[in-house]
Design a protein with these regions (language model features):
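A residue-level marker of the well-folded mature domains of exported/periplasmic proteins
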Residues: 1-168
Length: 168
């Protein structure tokens, strides 16, 4: 358990619609850990890339050697954090978002420090977009402008269900 642990957030702030989703992920994480004994000791912008995630994580673990976990708003930056931590021989757990094929491959390794990725089904997202577009093209108003697409965790307990798929 990671109770009373130091954590780090790898985020991607900005004003594009994609970044709005990233900001929501970060805020959801912060809301969830509030009052539960976690101390966010660092937050950094990895620009959603493996390269930046790796470089900055290397610097962060030097300055904060007691970090126990990194939450990354996407798997690309999470994979960079994973690479830096693996190279440094640090057992710091990484949690990402997207269900990226690369992340799933390392989650599948025995005792991987990349513990989990949260995912949504791109197929479901595509179907919901199609339904909304079809409604708009027909000149009708959609019932809802926001559609909730459920997220789910991919970790060592269910990785076999998702490992062979590029995306869910």
């Amino acid at each position: 358990a990671l109770i009373s642990s130091s954590v780090c957030i790898c985020h991607d702030p900005g004003s594009s619609p994609a970044n709005n989703a990233c900001n929501d992920r970060e805020q959801g994480f912060l809301d969830t850990i509030e009052g539960k004994g976690f101390d966010v000791v660092a937050t950094f912008d990895a620009e959603g890339t493996v390269e930046k995630g790796q470089t900055i994580t290397s610097d962060i673990i030097q300055a904060n050697p007691d970090i126990k976990a990194i939450f990354s708003i996407n798997d690309q930056a999470g994979m960079g954090a994973y690479a830096a931590l693996t190279t440094a021989g640090k057992e710091v757990y990484v949690y990402g978002v997207d269900g990226a094929p690369e992340a799933k491959k390392v989650i599948a390794k025995d005792n991987s420090i990349y513990r989990m990725t949260a995912a949504q089904s791109p197929i479901t997202i595509g179907k919901e977009c199609y339904k909304a577009a079809k409604t708009l093209i027909a000149g009708e108003k959609p019932e809802e402008f926001e559609v909730d697409v459920p997220a789910f965790a991919i970790d060592s307990s269910n990785i076999d269900e998702y490992l062979d798929a590029d995306w869910q």
